[in-house]
Amino acid sequence: MEGTWIEVRVITKSEALEPISGIFYGLDCKGVAIEDPNDILGREQGPLTWDFADINILEHKGKVAVVKGYFSEEDNIDDVIAYVKERVEELKESGLDVGEGTVEAEKMFEEDWANNWKKYYKPIKIGEKIVIKPIWEEYEPTGEEMVVELDPGMAFGTGDHETTRMCVQALDKYVKADTTVFDIGTGSGILALVASKLGAKHVLGVDLDPVAVDSAKENISFNNVDNIEVLYGNLLDVVDGKADIVVANIIAEIICILVDDVKKALNKDGIFITSGIIHERRQMVIDKLEQEGFEVMEVNKDGEWNCIVAKLK
């Protein structure tokens, strides 16, 4: 998207997001965005996250969600608004609670559209020490807090996903001063940065996505650390040497494929921290780890997700 665009938005409730999104998808719009406070407020939060949440989100908890469609200036916006209003009214008449159901329009520039999501990404404290802070926010650490500066861009890993949180908590438990850590599927570099901040001697991040590699390298530069290396390549194929800890926040099927390579990449008694595992795939991963000579030490759960910590026997 370039230049000036028209944002048409419907003020609604969380339960009406899907059908109202469908209205926009049925039009020739250039993009659809959804803002749902329940995505932020619906999970258990620590006090720091609550303190840094936008006041608008807190005020509208459970009441307001927004669906936005983006249109070219050449589009007949009056017709678009009339059509959206008509369809929202039909949903209301069908018995769906659409909340306010108001339709608004606003001219926006590409930069506004591209950065609008940032207002929902705030500092998050994970455990006792780690604070994940977006680079555009201010935060003053206290006590032993360690701040990871992050601009996730298009790469996965912001700290607010259950799988990332559990991996951070596991790293906090197992990383020691002389530890070497491999981060497989590094994404934004968040786990590599956490390992570095916790005192790891050397950290290596690997990802198949060149966008993720660039994102991780940029985030490393924000944090002024010099013990992290990021490589583009086929996971462990590009890794030399061995690690004391391998962390992989991916999906269960890929984890099972990687277990043999992880085994080769770990020192004796090395730790494998892995997440991205839904409940239905948990036992599959445990079985594979045990078949390959790992001892499962922990199975942690958060929402629909699991994090498994295993030691190479």
Swiss-Prot record:
Locations listed in the record: Cytoplasm
EC number: 2.1.1.-
Annotated Gene Ontology cellular component terms: cytoplasm
Catalyzed reactions: L-lysyl-[protein] + 3 S-adenosyl-L-methionine = N(6),N(6),N(6)-trimethyl-L-lysyl-[protein] + 3 S-adenosyl-L-homocysteine + 3 H(+)
PANTHER family: ELECTRON TRANSFER FLAVOPROTEIN BETA SUBUNIT LYSINE METHYLTRANSFERASE
Function: Methylates ribosomal protein L11.
Name of the molecule in the record: Ribosomal protein L11 methyltransferase
Annotated source species: Clostridium perfringens (strain ATCC 13124 / DSM 756 / JCM 1290 / NCIMB 6125 / NCTC 8237 / Type A)
